[in-house]
Amino acid sequence: MKIKIINRSHHPLPAYATSASAGMDLRASIEEPITLLPLERRLIPTGLFIELPVGYEAQIRPRSGLALRHGITLVNSPGTIDADYRGEIGIIMINLSNTPFTIADGERICQLVIARHEQAEWVLTDELADTERGAGGFGHTGKE
């Protein structure tokens, strides 16, 4: 699949790390380092603009290494970029650790996954089909 992209950063285009990778790393495109204090969140620019085909979305997901080693993740995860959005891709990051974390220009800050999606059409009804689970949720299927 070919996707149009504008790159206003001075970093390489996002790329798959391996032939089986689902996500491509996105990089911060900032003029000076940004320090996230504990529990602080900031919108981090990437310098990237994309044009997705209708029927596709781009999902923005955390990088597992940043989350594990530094407690850095995304506030809305996954974030969704719709096919009709044409603005800059911005990443809402948060520091869930107890120590400040500094983001440098060019640092890999998240992953982007391209995914097909459907649009649902609601069918209004007064009842739903019975299932074994029923209305049980929030841990109802077991604790082990």
Swiss-Prot record:
EC number: 3.6.1.23
Record protein name field: Deoxyuridine 5'-triphosphate nucleotidohydrolase
Keywords, ordered alphabetically: Hydrolase, Magnesium, Metal-binding, Nucleotide metabolism
Stated role: This enzyme is involved in nucleotide metabolism: it produces dUMP, the immediate precursor of thymidine nucleotides and it decreases the intracellular concentration of dUTP so that uracil cannot be incorporated into DNA.
Keyword Hydrolase: yes
Organism whose genome encodes this protein: Porphyromonas gingivalis (strain ATCC 33277 / DSM 20709 / CIP 103683 / JCM 12257 / NCTC 11834 / 2561)
InterPro entries named in the record: dUTPase, dUTPase-like, dUTPase-like_sf, dUTPase_trimeric
Cofactor(s) this protein requires: Mg(2+)
Transmembrane residue ranges: none
Superkingdom as given in the UniProt entry: Bacteria
Gene label: dut
